Regions:
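Glycine-rich phosphate/ribose-binding loops and adjacent secondary-structure elements
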Residues: 47, 51-182, 188-192, 197
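Conserved small/polar residues in nucleotide/adenosyl-binding loops
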Residues: 200-206
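Extended, highly charged accessory segments
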Residues: 1-69, 75, 79, 86
Length: 210
C-alpha cells in the first residue's frame, strides 16, 4: 500500500536522484499528515495548495473557468519548482461551491500529461467528498497519489462526541476507518490484476502517457 510523493526521474536512467521521494505507508492521509506535507521544507520538495472552488453565482461557466484557472496555477507552480500539489475544497460557503474532486483531479492529471509535466509532481486531494472505498479508488485511479477525507474524520468525531458510537476513542476509530478503507482499495486493485497502490495511481499515470 506504499505510495511515493515527489518528482519522478527518468525511468531509463538509474541515478540516486530518482529515489528522492517521500514514502507514505498508504494513500489515505490524516489531517496531521497532510499538514506536515503542506509545510515540507526538505530540499527537493515543495508543496502548494490549489483551490477546488468556484463562485456559485457564476454557474457552469464559472466551473469551467475555475478549472482553467486551476490548470494555469499548476503550470506556473511547476515552473517554480513545486512538485506536490494539494487540491483542496476547504472554504466551501454559500458563495463558493466545490469543484467535484474527481473532475478536478482527472482534469489536472490529463492537463499535465498534455503539457508533458505529469511526472514532475504528485497530486494530493484534500476533500470533503470521499468517504467510501469506491470514492478513494476512483480518485487514486484518476491521478491522485494520496487523499485526505477530512469530512469523514469530522463525521467520526461527531458520532463519538454525540454518543452514537461508544466504547472507542476517536484516534482508534479513525485508524479503524483508514484500515478498513485501505483493505477495500487493495481489493479493488487486486480485481484489476494490480498488486500495489502505486501502480494503481491512474494506472501508473496512464502508463506514462503510453
Amino acid at each position: 500500500t506504499d505510495v511515493m510523493l515527489g518528482t519522478e526521474g527518468n525511468l531509463l536512467e538509474s541515478v540516486p536522484e530518482n529515489c528522492h521521494q517521500i514514502r507514505l505507508k498508504n494513500p489515505i492521509l490524516t489531517n496531521e499528515q497532510l499538514a506536515k506535507l503542506a509545510r515540507v521544507k526538505e530540499p527537493g520538495f515543495k508543496a502548494q495548495k490549489l483551490p477546488m472552488l468556484f463562485p456559485v453565482r457564476s454557474g457552469p461557466e464559472g466551473l469551467e473557468k475555475a478549472l482553467e484557472y486551476l490548470f494555469m496555477l499548476a503550470d506556473e507552480a511547476i515552473e517554480q519548482g513545486v512538485n506536490i500539489f494539494i487540491l483542496s475544497d476547504r472554504g466551501v460557503s454559500r458563495e463558493m461551491a466545490p469543484i467535484p474532486a474527481l473532475l478536478a483531479t482527472a482534469g489536472l492529471h490529463h492537463h499535465l500529461i498534455r503539457r508533458e509535466t505529469r511526472t514532475q509532481c504528485a497530486l494530493v486531494v484534500e476533500s470533503g467528498e470521499p468517504r467510501e472505498v469506491h470514492h478513494f479508488a476512483l480518485l487514486i485511479g484518476y491521478g491522485a497519489t494520496a487523499v485526505n477525507p477530512y469530512m469523514a474524520y469530522e463525521t467520526i468525531y461527531d458520532m463519538i462526541d454525540q454518543g452514537l458510537v461508544t466504547d472507542i476513542v476517536y484516534e482508534k476509530a479513525k485508524a479503524n476507518y483508514i484500515k478498513a478503507s485501505m483493505k477495500g482499495v487493495v481489493k479493488v486493485c487486486s480485481k484489476m490484476g494490480i498488486s500495489t497502490c502505486l501502480l494503481y495511481t491512474s494506472d501508473a499515470a496512464d502508463e506514462r502517457s503510453s
